[in-house]
Amino acid sequence: MKADRATLEKLFSYPLDGWGCIEVEFEVTDMPGYENCWMGKMPDPEHQEQELFWFGLKPDGTEAWDYHSLFDFMSAPIFKGKTLCDISEKINVLSVDGTDPAERMQFYLYDRKDPIRFA
């Protein structure tokens, strides 16, 4: 599933309220070396009232970063000098929270101001 910048910003703006996490497996098309990557958001283990945004780009942990703000997370030049904003159109989401990305993204992207609709 492709994800653009607006989708990623909305996904990672979802309030965790001190519990749970968002975990995204992804690849970056046309950028060798970024085939099995992870990014996410969770409560900061040391300060549960704060959120921690993170990347894990290599399975061996050599390219792993934590950020305390969405701005820093989105604008860190960790993809060969490019930011998540720069490469957002190349992001292919493989899973969200270990499930089908199209299904799970609906939960995070749903506008909570809209009334709940039943089929």
Question: Where are the language model's segments positioned?
Answer:
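Amphipathic, interaction-prone secondary-structure segments
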Residues: 17-59
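Negatively charged, low-complexity tracts enriched in Asp/Glu with abundant Ser/Thr
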Residues: 1-27
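Acidic, low-complexity intrinsically disordered segments
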Residues: 64-119
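Intrinsically disordered, low-complexity regions of eukaryotic proteins
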Residues: 6, 25-27, 37, 68, ...
